[in-house]
Amino acid sequence: MAEEKKAPISVWTTVKPFVNGGASGMLATCVIQPIDMIKVRIQLGQGSAASITTNMLKNEGVGAFYKGLSAGLLRQATYTTARLGSFKLLTAKAIESNDGKPLPLYQKALCGLTAGAIGACVGSPADLALIRMQADNTLPLAQRRNYTNAFHALTRISADEGVLALWKGCGPTVVRAMALNMGMLASYDQSAEYMRDNLGFGEMSTVVGASAVSGFCAAACSLPFDFVKTQIQKMQPDAQGKYPYTGSLDCAMKTLKEGGPLKFYSGFPVYCVRIAPHVMMTWIFLNQITKFQKKIGM
């Protein structure tokens, strides 16, 4: 009987990091969605952040900033649930194997790389839907897909292009996620330890400060891969049915040849502004959710 009573607690203990991670990511996305929309349009060559914002308000209205929100929430429910939950379990196992000692930076980075790959594989279909929905209004009328929501996009993509098309661009998505999570997760833990132990920061100051550092590191590590991923996912065939890029490497080489290395960092200020607050709010929400659960004994 005693073993039967422990089972639900064990299941919740395992599931909790995934639930908390997904919930915190979805809450953060609701706030960051407008900045993410602007970032995508900058990468698609629509102009500066100021001009894009002005044109969207003038021509499309406030609702345009939230186009693709359903896909963004679905992405967090899959990608962030998987990556943050996996990272928590991986680091716990690593600490256990390390006799309870704090992990060195390289082990945190490896856990972040692995968690990012897992999350990207799970969240790739939702990420594809999000990119296409955000880019739709930038296309000529005849080429627009007119998806009504994330589930409509996933259904249409499966029906028109095949189920495997849901993982189009999965390669660069996984690489980008590995780079982002290595920067985000490892630097957050390392910064939090330093700010708390060496600088004497309080709990909230530590969360905010470490989140800002991890957000910048995540942006710097991942933007080149994000740029390539976006180009691959939004590309369409020409009149002869030929795509502009044969794959991620071809896209990267053509971009390097035509625009130089800095082309990969198009929209970096906006991307950094988008990543850092999202990371900060994800950690803050996660911190508050965890505190609330402890308070009520969950």
Curated annotation (Swiss-Prot):
It comes from the Eukaryota. Solcar repeats lie at residues 12-93, 103-194, 202-292. Keywords: Membrane, Mitochondrion, Mitochondrion inner membrane, Repeat, Transmembrane, Transmembrane helix, Transport. The chain crosses the membrane at residues 18-38, 68-88, 109-129, 169-189, 208-228, 268-288. It is found in: Mitochondrion inner membrane. Its main location: mitochondrion. The keyword Transmembrane applies. PROSITE patterns: SOLCAR. It is a multi-pass membrane protein. One of its GO terms (cellular component) is plant-type cell wall. Catalyzes the transport of dicarboxylates, such as oxoglutarate, oxaloacetate, malate, and succinate, and of tricarboxylates, such as citrate, isocitrate, cis-aconitate, and trans-aconitate by a counter-exchange mechanism across the inner mitochondrial membrane. Substrate preference in reconstituted proteoliposomes is oxaloacetate > malonate > malate > maleate > succinate > oxoglutarate > citrate > trans-aconitate > cis-aconitate > sulfate > isocitrate. This is Mitochondrial dicarboxylate/tricarboxylate transporter DTC. It comes from Arabidopsis thaliana. The lineage of its organism: Eukaryota, Viridiplantae, Streptophyta, Embryophyta, Tracheophyta.
